[in-house]
Amino acid sequence: KVRTDAAGAPLKDGDRVAGAFAYDRDTGEFILFKAKAVVLATGGIGRAFLVTSNSWEYTGDGHALAYHAGAELVDMEFVQFHPTGMMWPPSVRGILVTEGVRGEGGILKNSEGKRFMFDDIPPLYQGSTADTPEEGWRYVIGDREARRPPELLTRDHVARKIVKEVKEGRGSPHGGAFLDIAWVKEKIKDSEAHIKKKLPSMYHQFKELAGIDITKEPMEVGPTTHYVMGGIKVDGDTQMCTTVPGLFAAGECGGGLHGANRLGGNSLSDLLVFGKRA
């Protein structure tokens, strides 16, 4: 197995890709691969943004390589932002804060302590969104007659609401909002044990990386670049064949499968199915 960084474009013989040229990070050597097909599985473009949940290698290299080889890119304007990424300290900025926090009753507040998500519920979702905090809490604890709290609206809407609060001067100290799960002590007798049981990874993540005890104080969160729906144009049937013979794309670097706004969890089935096919 050779760990490489892509260097230059895939090699072509006429109109067809016939191999690739790479750089071995461990030895410093250049390597020439001759192949009947090249499969790009380079992930997304998250690291092109200042704040992202993506790994360090998600720099869009595959997109650039495919483009220079003559492939088409599609839907690159469709970028998904997860509304809750860590905001502080700088070393953890962008790391994902699971939607499970809001699912267990976490609420979003601005610097004035106001729960702002009730202020602007899109008409499309008004019929399925709680009118009051009381109804929202009933939904959290399993009341089937209650509607969901506004913190559980779509990712794009929640992200825009946080950005709006920041732009209007009501953001948290480091450019986000406060996500508070500790408030459930008003509803649950032994809230500290409850939070640790329901959200163990989040408890340890904030305790170890940010020095925050989420059972006692709010988390500082903000939008983080999470996924790009666009990418290298692939065939609609196989979701792998690009517009260049011999060049294939699998996973997030391929575009079009998820439309304009990917549904949560679908990227996992995407990469498993088309990664296996590749």
Q: Where are the regions a protein language model picked out?
A:
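Conserved redox-cofactor binding core of oxidoreductases
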Residues: 1-29, 41, 85-89, 94, ...
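A glycine-rich dinucleotide-binding beta-alpha-beta segment and adjacent secondary-structure elements
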Residues: 1-16, 23, 194-256
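Glycine-/small-residue-rich beta->alpha transition segments that form the dinucleotide
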Residues: 26, 35-37, 41-46, 210, ...
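Core beta-strand elements of the Rossmann-like FAD/NAD(P) dinucleotide-binding domain
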Residues: 26-37, 242-246
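Glycine-rich loop(s) and the adjacent beta-strand/alpha-helix scaffold that form part
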Residues: 37-95, 127, 266-277
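An anion/pyrophosphate-binding glycine-rich loop and adjacent beta-alpha core
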Residues: 72-208
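Catalytic phosphate/nucleotide-handling subdomain of diverse soluble enzymes
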Residues: 242-278
